Amino acid sequence: MKTIYSISKHEVSDEQIEKDRLFKVFVLGLPRSGTSLMTSICQTLGVNMIHTTENKKDEYDKRYKEKFGEYHPNESGFFEIGENFLEHYLEIIDKPYSGCKMIIPVVGLRLDIIKLIPSKVIMMWRDPKEIKESQEAFYSNDSDESYLRTALATQKVNLEKSGVDFMVCHYEKLVNDSYREIYSVSDFILSDKGHKEAVALVDPEKHRFRKEEIPV
């Protein structure tokens, strides 16, 4: 029987929690599907997450805050290709209750790597039309909605076939019903803290980024 840490408030010893958490957390999704937001949520819930924008955050603040508000572009400019995944993967191996994020277009055979260790994957799912609009606004290029739809469906099937423990988090629900969605994530990753703080991270006005709403 699964122990629900956050909702039922079962008393669980620190030793038992540590034993149960012998897994790594991976946030998986397409660019502009909510992976950065979910990474921050997992961090707030207590997971030692690696953020891809940490090293250049000050630089991004200076260059882009005026145009994009609080949004921070990733380490590759506006399009994250995820070239540092292996480095991040190796870094979290020996770090307790840790994780990092992956971007679907460059995930390749990484599910096979993830299967080598106990893992929990949170797959972000967003309407491909919204992803297309957001990508076109931020990356200044054309995006193929049919490709995005196929990429999402294919990755979900791959996860189902892999046997990896995963959940799908819908971006729309995360933004519009953040309390319920974050508690589901919290239970999935066996978090016992930071729930209210994680919910407070979600701002429906900020986490939308439809093409016509981007300031120019």
Where is each model-derived feature located?
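PAPS-dependent sulfotransferase catalytic core
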Residues: 1-94, 201-216
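PAPS-dependent sulfotransferase catalytic domain
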Residues: 99-195
